[in-house]
Structures are given as structure tokens and as C-alpha cells.
């Protein structure tokens, strides 16, 4: 029989594992964030390539790209099943970084659906973009992808408002407005606003949906944006079927 102190210590270690993992990810990302070149993420790109060599890649998957918020996003694969899903997050990477690695993150997988979740890094440290600059970067990424004449649908999240960075709220509101305006002329682009599902009655981000760092979503927050994506995908598919007479 194990002593009570031994059992308590073991349980404490189990509880600390997720925290240690997050601290490890953050420390890696902070170091990389100080490097302005997209090469800061070359090791993560190489790790994905190595994993792909021993995997059977799905046909026309849903590919989700972004920064740390994508790396920490769990459960989407099960929720969107039987659609195959590949999560391809890169530390605190920006949209410009993802454009740089287009071949590795998008072209290699030939997705039927591309999902983009921009992170807070767009407005801090490496970039400090304005809303207009972020939307321009997103449009550049989509235009590059479309230049290969491979038909696919694009689902683009507006950046998530976080409890920690209240100074970003006006930029995010303007980003959402500009994205919605642009998407009106882009039939293959759908804009998703996660903030309507993550705020309290006062319109500020609800801490119940975020980790203690005030930046990254917890499991409750991720469930809400996962359901938003799932419902939007299903709705668009039903509309497509209806347009060709399938019910």
C-alpha cells in the first residue's frame, strides 16, 4: 500500500503536467517571437514534415493554420469527423509567416477547406500590425493560394479578444469589419466572429473561457469556437446541396 503523502504527491504531479507543458510551449514561442524572420519556425515545420513521412495523409482534409492558439486547440478532429482534420499551428507565427510557409502548411496537404485563426502576435512584438495591415496580409495569403487554381473553401476567424490585451479590442473590431467587407466579393471565403461567443454581457471577454494567462482559450472556449466552425461548415454544405437540388 502507498502512503497518503505518496498518493497526494503523485496526484499533484499529474495536475502540474499541463501547466509545465504550457510553460514549455510559451518559453519556446517567446524566444522565437524575438526573431523577426519566418525561419524562427523552421524546426516546427521540419517536425511536421518528419511526422508526415510516416503518416497516410488524408484526401482534401480540413487544414487549420495559425499560431499557438491552433497548437493548443484540441478536440476539433473528433467534432468534425468524418471530415479529416490536420492542425498546423506554428508557435506565435503571424499570417506573413504562414504565407512564407505556404507550400509546407497548405500546398503539401491539398486541403478542401482551409481554416485560419490569426493570433495576438499580429498586434505585438514581431509585427504590431494595424487592422488594415492584418487584412491585407490575409488577402495576400488567400490570393497566393488561389493562384494555384486549386478550388477550396476558406474559413477565416477574426482575431480573438483576450482579457489580457484590452488595447487590441478596437483593432479587432475594425479587422472584423474589413474582413466582412472583403468577403462580400469572395464567394469562397467565410468570415467567423468568435468574439460573440466568448464575451460576457458587458461585451468584454469572459475569463471563464480563457486560461489563467488571459490569452489562450481553455477547453470551454475551444468548444465554443469548435461548434461555431462545425455549424458554419454544416450550414454551408446544406446550402450547397440545396442549390443543386439535393436534400
Regions found by a protein language model. Name each.
Residues 61, 113-115, 153:
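Structural motif
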Residues 1-61, 236-247:
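N-terminal secretory targeting modules
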Residues 54, 59-75, 91-93:
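Catalytic nucleophile-elbow at a beta strand-turn-alpha helix junction centered on a G-D-S/GDSL motif
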Amino acid at each position: 500500500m502507498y502512503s497518503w503523502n505518496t498518493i497526494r504527491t503523485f496526484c499533484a504531479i499529474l495536475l502540474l503536467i499541463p501547466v509545465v507543458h504550457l510553460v514549455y510551449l510559451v518559453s519556446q514561442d517567446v524566444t522565437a517571437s524575438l526573431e523577426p524572420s519566418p525561419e524562427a519556425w523552421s524546426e516546427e515545420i521540419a517536425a511536421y514534415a518528419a511526422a508526415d513521412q510516416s503518416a497516410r495523409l488524408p484526401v482534401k482534409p480540413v487544414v487549420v493554420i495559425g499560431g499557438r492558439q491552433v497548437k493548443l486547440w484540441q478536440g476539433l478532429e473528433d467534432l468534425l469527423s468524418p471530415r479529416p482534420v490536420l492542425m498546423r499551428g506554428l508557435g506565435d507565427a503571424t499570417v506573413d509567416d504562414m504565407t512564407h510557409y505556404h507550400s509546407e502548411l497548405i500546398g503539401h496537404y491539398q486541403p478542401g477547406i482551409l481554416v485560419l485563426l490569426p493570433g495576438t502576435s499580429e498586434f505585438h512584438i514581431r509585427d504590431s500590425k494595424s487592422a488594415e495591415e492584418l487584412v491585407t496580409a490575409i488577402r495576400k495569403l488567400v490570393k497566393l493560394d488561389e493562384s494555384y487554381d486549386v478550388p477550396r473553401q476558406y474559413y477565416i476567424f477574426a482575431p480573438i479578444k483576450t482579457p489580457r490585451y484590452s488595447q487590441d479590442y478596437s483593432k479587432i473590431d475594425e479587422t472584423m469589419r474589413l474582413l466582412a467587407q472583403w468577403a462580400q466579393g469572395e464567394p469562397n471565403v467565410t468570415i467567423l466572429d468568435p468574439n460573440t461567443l466568448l464575451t460576457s454581457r458587458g461585451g468584454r471577454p469572459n475569463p471563464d473561457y480563457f486560461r489563467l494567462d488571459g490569452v489562450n482559450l481553455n477547453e470551454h472556449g475551444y468548444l465554443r469556437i469548435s461548434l461555431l466552425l462545425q455549424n458554419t461548415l454544416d450550414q454551408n454544405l446544406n446550402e450547397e446541396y440545396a442549390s443543386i437540388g439535393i436534400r
